[in-house]
Amino acid sequence: MARLKEIYRNEIAPKLKEELKLSNVMEVPRVTKITLNMGLGEAIGDKKVIEHAVADLEKITGQKPVVTFARKSIAGFKVREGWPIGVKVTLRRDKMYEFLDRLLAISLPRVRDFRGLNAKSFDGRGNYSMGVKEQIIFPEIDYDKIDALRGLDITLTTTARSDDEGRALLRAFKFPFRN
């Protein structure tokens, strides 16, 4: 079992149950999935960009990403319907907890000028989204072998009913929010 999953079950869930005054341990908010998305606008001119992004995301997550396609044509962006414009991965269960553990313990401290995560990036339903400017903060990516610096979006979907519950859950996981 993933280290963070054990910590959640044995320490975080009972603590949150008390803190949020819940009657049943199953009511305690939990992380259900983590979605990583890489939007690749530069893929329009060069199809190799998609292959490199797929390889990077596969190294980061240990799971094969899905290529996303444009749903409709947008002349302003020079995009046609059906063209590949990004890659995404959805992590669940043990892989999700292992990724979250690596993100908090290894990757976020490697971000340049890191002052903490924005505590206001919740969506109103307890889900949290954040952006990473460079994929090189992940130790799985070799700096010498990348073709370009690419950012990615990370979304944590939770069972929390409100932003306050979601914030309490992520604080219990020791997310480094700035004040």
UniProtKB/Swiss-Prot annotation:
GO cellular component annotations of the record: ribonucleoprotein complex; ribosome
Tree of life domain: Bacteria
Keywords recorded for this protein, A-Z: Ribonucleoprotein, Ribosomal protein, RNA-binding, rRNA-binding, tRNA-binding
Family: Belongs to the universal ribosomal protein uL5 family.
PANTHER family, per the entry: 60S RIBOSOMAL PROTEIN L11-RELATED (PTHR11994)
InterPro entries named in the record: Ribosomal_uL5 (IPR002132), Ribosomal_uL5_bac-type (IPR020930), Ribosomal_uL5_C (IPR031309), Ribosomal_uL5_CS (IPR020929), Ribosomal_uL5_dom_sf (IPR022803), Ribosomal_uL5_N (IPR031310)
Protein name (Swiss-Prot/TrEMBL): Large ribosomal subunit protein uL5
Role played: This is one of the proteins that bind and probably mediate the attachment of the 5S RNA into the large ribosomal subunit, where it forms part of the central protuberance. In the 70S ribosome it contacts protein S13 of the 30S subunit (bridge B1b), connecting the 2 subunits; this bridge is implicated in subunit movement. Contacts the P site tRNA; the 5S rRNA and some of its associated proteins might help stabilize positioning of ribosome-bound tRNAs.
Cited HAMAP family: Ribosomal_uL5_B
Oligomeric and partner information: Part of the 50S ribosomal subunit; part of the 5S rRNA/L5/L18/L25 subcomplex. Contacts the 5S rRNA and the P site tRNA. Forms a bridge to the 30S subunit in the 70S ribosome.
Single GO biological process annotation from the record: translation
Organism: Pseudomonas entomophila (strain L48)
GO molecular function: rRNA binding; structural constituent of ribosome; tRNA binding
Keyword match Transmembrane: no
SUPFAM superfamilies: RL5-like (SSF55282)
Pfam families reported in the protein's UniProt record: Ribosomal_L5 (PF00281), Ribosomal_L5_C (PF00673)
